[in-house]
Swiss-Prot record:
A molecular function GO annotation: zinc ion binding
Keywords: Aminopeptidase, Cytoplasm, Hydrolase, Metal-binding, Metalloprotease, Protease, Zinc
Organism in which the protein naturally occurs: Bacillus cytotoxicus (strain DSM 22905 / CIP 110041 / 391-98 / NVH 391-98)
Enzyme class: hydrolase
Superkingdom of source: Bacteria
One GO term describing the cellular component: cytosol
EC number(s) recorded for this UniProt protein: 3.4.11.4
Similarity remark: Belongs to the peptidase M20B family.
Cited function: Cleaves the N-terminal amino acid of tripeptides.
Pfam families: M20_dimer, Peptidase_M20
Reaction(s) catalysed by this chain's protein: Release of the N-terminal residue from a tripeptide
SUPFAM superfamilies: Bacterial exopeptidase dimerisation domain, Zn-dependent exopeptidases
Binding site for Zn(2+) 2: 142, 177, 381
Name this protein carries in UniProt: Peptidase T
Amino acid sequence: MRQELIERFTRYVKIDTQSNEESHTVPSTPGQIEFGKQLVEELKQIGLIEVTMDENGYVMATLPANTDKDVPVIGFLAHLDTATDFTGKNVKPQIHENFDGKAITLNEELNVVLTPEQFPELPSYKGHTLITTDGTTLLGADDKAGLTEIMTAMNYLIHNPQIKHGKIRVAFTPDEEIGRGPSHFDVKAFGASFAYTMDGGPLGGLEYESFNAASAKLTFKGNNTHPGTAKNKMLNASKIAMEFHSQLPAEEAPEYTEGYEGFYHLLSLNGDVEQSKAYYIIRDFDRGNFEARKNKIKQIVEKMQEKYGEENIILEMKDQYYNMLEKIEPVKEIVDIAYDAMKNLNIEPNIQPIRGGTDGSQLSYMGLPTPNIFTGGENYHGKFEYVSVDNMEKATHVIIEIARLFEERA
């Protein structure tokens, strides 16, 4: 299995599948379509049936049940795209067998070094086989590690029919990194009662709480005149934007929060005297606090509109996704099975809230409760990204054990 994981993963990461937020096509980039087509062929070769790829690039397939028991249909999902934060073109994965726990020089020429000082978890991987970047790109373990693990688990189950399981559906989705993953996902066609995204990080990660999320776009309009004769005439849009921002709690920002704490995050601010635009994201685990945060923004805007004119401050706010805990709690047994699967494999489950969202956040509200499971990667979205092959192997066995436990408990 180990060599199969390495071969499959290193092949996948060399395919450029970065999504593109500016694009209006589905999926947002052609690389995802090409990758999807390759996965369709590979799924067929492995022996899965009902292998499809729709016009939006969603790949689905079935591993038929090999038991007479009435087992719920379960699904495993991963996403095709990689993050937009750093280049994902020409990825050159580097394999480090029996890692010594010390600093790894990723790129001598550019002096890119993965150090324990910067990444304190690094020495804990001593003895593992690590796959890193060459220091010039991201790796794409998010989420090609998940794709690799699902493929490898399906192949293993086909070749080990003594492991009894119900019907399993797999799906590979585009554009997760730009928040559009579930936008065109056909829950009915997928036909699973529950699913798991293989899209987590380090060993043991089991996540079924996510942020409630909203975005706020603010447009501030000013009036530009010659600064020499501007008294009582000029209205500086950039200053109005700064005034707005100053009324948000400074300590409730990503750089000051952790755990279950929510925040307001100014993603971008640009403009001039005539017009300025600010883009925020609002995040909180608690629905009441989430609504209160949105109301605070509305109240600040309304107060400032009284001062500067309604037409000069325009707010566009929309909800993005909600905390999946609300939809997963009624079917908590799916979390319990994943927990027990890890325990059976001597993996200590690490249950943490996701300070972000996964496809599962939205899918859970679309009728497909979907917790998230670790894949074995670290430092996603940048040149210091790496993955432990040892922990990819463990994640693959978690998939297999979940399938076995669902059948055993049916």
